UniProtKB/Swiss-Prot annotation:
Belongs to the RimP family. The lineage of its organism: Bacteria, Bacillati, Cyanobacteriota, Cyanophyceae, Synechococcales. It is found in: Cytoplasm. This is Ribosome maturation factor RimP. GO terms for cellular component: cytosol. InterPro entries: Ribosome_maturation_RimP, RimP_C_sf, RimP_N, RimP_N_sf. One of its GO terms (biological process) is translation. Required for maturation of 30S ribosomal subunits. Keywords: Cytoplasm, Ribosome biogenesis. Its main location: cytoplasm. The keyword Cytoplasm applies.
């Protein structure tokens, strides 16, 4: 499948997603498989979680649109899934959901020897991130934070 065909396929799938209030996160074609595999990752436009029923709901009209478009002249398998849980915390919802969970905070302090801090997610405000490091609360200004990721803590 060439770039133009893939672009047409993505546009077609976007139309189906828009009708159902979903957003296409990615479309991955595995043309080395027989039949080829089309992996589509979707999310809801309102930020709610994607369920198995949502994937099934998207599958039928997506399959029909692909068939009606005659873009693919061969058999294919359509796989619909959600984004899943990312290790990186980015949204307000992530910070509420994972409060108390172990996190790794990557710092952008160029002159400091400390590049990472590990602790339990305690609080997030608009100005700082607070983590619990062995019972002590450490407030880190957001301008010093590069990335916040879930991790596992070892004693």
């Amino acid at each position: 499948m060439n770039k133009e065909q893939k672009s047409r396929l993505e546009n077609l799938l976007e139309k189906v997603a828009n009708v159902l209030d979903y957003k296409i996160c990615s479309v991955n074609l595995q043309t080395n498989q027989n039949p080829i595999v089309i992996k589509i990752i979707i999310k809801k436009t309102n930020g709610d979680d994607i369920s198995l029923d949502d994937c099934a709901l998207f599958n039928t009209p997506a399959s029909e649109e692909i068939e009606n478009s005659n873009l693919l002249k061969c058999s294919y398998v359509l796989e619909i899934s959600s984004q899943g849980v990312s290790d990186e915390l980015t949204s307000e919802r992530d910070f509420k959901t994972f409060k108390g969970f172990p996190v790794n905070v990557e710092l952008n302090q160029k002159n400091s020897k400390i590049k990472f801090l590990n602790g339990l997610l305690y609080e997030k405000s608009k100005d700082y991130l607070a983590i619990n490091i062995k019972g002590k609360i450490k407030k880190i200004p957001f301008n010093e934070v590069l990335k916040i990721s879930l991790c596992t803590l070892k004693d």
